[in-house]
Design a protein with these regions (language model features):
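Structured, active/binding-site neighborhoods that engage oxygen-rich ligands
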Residues: 1-346
């Protein structure tokens, strides 16, 4: 059992670090990455002029997912959890679109996260997330909001795996991804990642956690593409191939199934070395920040914060907030004025 602060922090900060590692090379081809960073690609965090490694929309949305499920927990089952998470995503959307929320519903737009200037920064927010949230219409598995399988549905759901048992995590991961992504691969991948993290926290090995997630996924309509991509990554992780060649066979990570699979490949290949796994997960032709974030979530939950390079932890943007929300996810609920101010909707 890894229901311990160091594994929760490992998951959340690990994801942010993977996100930051991949950020400078997102949209770049591997050839260009190697020309800029050397034959092994990028292998260290890029710092801004303040000495900070900046996160992207992946970590921004992960924080709002965490806030959403913590708010839902305050309601003690008297709510539809995805709807509470959806309201959290509307808060994130308001930061990205510079919306003046004065006069808006206070329950939706009152949040301590909105005090952090960094969460208003444009860090490459995905078009599907922005378009879906602009409709103010809640997507669901039964009533898909679109046919998108972009990776924006999976890259944000890791906190769900920390809060819920594996069965609930899979279901809720699917539901929360489906808020904005309507293709089966777009939301089943969210369920699988949430389930994998929940299983790891329960004490499973990574390969066991993946098998558990696959078993849940196979009960869903339209599971084939996502499961086949993940199974391909598992197989490739056991082969003696150059990592970049293996990842090229999986894809580029722009779709949810590919992003999850690349992260799974890297986590299995280097399950005892956080740094090597993250470097592997971002050096490819595609969506490097998302594959890095998901890999960081998985391996951070597995290895814990003590096995993440301290020099990376010290420079990650919003480090204190990430640590605090990790601790809150472990606590789940607390009868205190401070807790109610943070997570109880008025």
């Amino acid at each position: 059992m890894k229901r311990d602060e160091k594994y929760f922090k490992g998951c959340i900060l690990g994801g942010a670090i993977g996100d930051a590692l991949g950020r400078p090379i997102e949209l770049k081809k591997l050839k260009e990455i190697k020309a800029t960073y050397g034959s092994k690609g990028i292998n260290n965090l890029t710092l801004n002029d303040k000495g900070i490694a900046e996160i992207t929309d992946d970590t921004q949305m992960t924080l709002f997912t965490a806030e959403g499920i913590l708010r839902a927990n305050c309601k003690k089952g008297r709510c539809y959890i995805p709807a509470v998470v959806y309201n959290a995503y509307l808060r994130w959307y308001s930061t990205q679109r510079n919306i003046d929320t004065k006069g808006y519903d206070e329950c939706t737009y009152n949040s301590y996260l909105l005090k952090y200037d960094e969460l208003y920064e444009d860090r490459g927010a995905g078009n599907t997330c922005l378009t879906s949230l602009s409709k103010e219409e809640i997507g669901s598995i039964k009533n898909p909001i679109n046919n998108s399988k972009g990776c924006g549905g999976v890259m944000r759901v890791a906190p769900i795996g920390l809060m819920y048992n594996k069965k609930e995590a899979f279901r809720l991961g699917c539901d929360c991804a489906a808020l904005t992504h309507g293709h089966p691969s777009g939301y089943i991948s969210g369920g699988m990642l949430s389930c994998i993290i929940s299983c790891i926290i329960e004490g499973m090995e990574i390969d066991e956690a993946i098998n558990c997630a696959i078993s849940f996924a196979k009960d869903m309509d339209g599971y084939c593409e996502c499961v086949e991509t993940v199974e391909k990554a598992v197989k490739l992780s056991k082969d003696d191939l150059v990592d970049t060649d293996a990842i090229r066979m999986i894809g580029e990570g722009w779709t949810s199934d590919e992003a999850l699979a690349i992260a799974i490949y890297s986590s299995l290949k280097y399950k005892d070395d956080f740094k090597k796994a993250l470097i592997c997960s971002v050096n490819h032709d595609g969506d490097s920040d998302s594959t890095g974030a998901i890999c960081g979530n998985i391996l951070g939950a597995y290895l814990g914060i003590d096995n993440i390079p301290k020099e990376w932890i010290d420079v990650i943007e919003l480090k204190e907030l990430l640590e605090n929300i990790s601790t809150d996810l472990l606590t789940g609920y607390e009868e205190s004025e401070e807790w109610f101010e943070k997570y109880l909707e008025n």
